[in-house]
């Protein structure tokens, strides 16, 4: 039987309008704060108001938003992306996130809504603000560089189950 690796996927929404993207992010932060407040009587009116603002803003930027589905790369391809985008200056390796994102997008994008040419997405990376590119970078980085070692969790679970069985 041939082994088959199932690579993780993640969706990221890219809002091309920087100002609106920042407004959505700020409202998201406000919503988190409002939700974390302990409201004892009735519903959290502030959270509802902020949520409605986010939905309204989302509708306004619908035509300027691209949902990108990324799939993790095999290690050898991820290494090639990093090596191609690393330069050494005075013995110090340096990388530009926008260049890594552009190259990774060419290999990692499996779907876009609305349908958008992958090359167009790669080319727009140098035009994005830090706030716009950050969610893309975090998705790419986490899909390809996050340590996944379930051994400790499996061993801990086994010890706990054995202890409970012995009791």
PLM regions and their residue ranges:
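Nucleic-acid-interacting cores, centered on viral/eukaryotic replication and modification enzymes
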Residues: 8-10, 142
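Short, intrinsically disordered N-terminal pre-domain segments
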Residues: 1-6
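Predominantly late transmembrane helices and immediately cytosolic-facing juxtamembrane segments
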Residues: 11-17, 21-23
């Amino acid at each position: 039987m041939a082994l088959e690796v199932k690579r993780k996927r993640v969706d990221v929404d890219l809002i091309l309008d920087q100002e609106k993207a920042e407004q959505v992010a700020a409202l998201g932060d406000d919503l988190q704060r409002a939700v974390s407040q302990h409201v004892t009587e009735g519903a959290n009116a502030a959270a509802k108001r902020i949520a409605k603002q986010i939905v309204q803003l989302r509708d306004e930027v619908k035509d300027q938003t691209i949902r990108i589905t990324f799939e993790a790369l095999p290690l050898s391809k991820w290494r090639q992306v990093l090596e191609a985008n690393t330069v050494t200056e005075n013995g110090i390796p340096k990388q530009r996130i926008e260049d890594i994102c552009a190259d990774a997008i060419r290999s990692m994008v499996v779907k876009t809504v609305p349908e958008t040419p992958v090359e167009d997405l790669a080319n727009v990376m140098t035009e994005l603000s830090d706030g716009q590119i950050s969610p893309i970078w975090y998705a790419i980085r986490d899909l390809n560089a996050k340590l996944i070692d379930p051994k400790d969790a499996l061993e801990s679970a086994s010890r706990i189950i054995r202890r409970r069985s012995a009791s």
